[in-house]
């Protein structure tokens, strides 16, 4: 099954998650292979954050949420299921019922 590509740059692309937590749940993925955040060179990491900001802004512009979470799971113990670095951008709405394992 293919996922819908929603954005692309020279080094990254963004696709809708195949098992979304919320409508518009999007993954930001580097085109080059890295396993975790620690493997991504600093300059590319900065570019990844800028690209993630663009994706998050687009989700809000599309009215898919009133806020968003940005999450990156690194290694299996932290919930990483695919061993290719990626960032989850999860649109949120008031009362959506989504709960994470920690308290802010």
Question: Predicted segments — roles?
Answer:
Residues 1-104:
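HIT superfamily nucleotide-processing domains
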């Amino acid at each position: 099954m293919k996922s819908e590509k929603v954005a692309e740059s020279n080094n990254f692309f963004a696709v809708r998650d195949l098992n979304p937590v919320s409508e518009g749940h999007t993954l930001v993925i580097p085109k080059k292979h890295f396993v975790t955040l620690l493997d991504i060179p600093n300059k590319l990491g900065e570019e990844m954050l800028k690209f993630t900001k663009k994706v998050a802004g687009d989700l809000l512009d599309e009215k898919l949420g009133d806020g968003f979470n940005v999450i990156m799971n690194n290694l299996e113990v932290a919930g990483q299921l695919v061993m290719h670095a990626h960032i989850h951008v999860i649109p949120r709405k008031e009362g959506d019922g989504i709960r994470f394992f920690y308290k802010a």
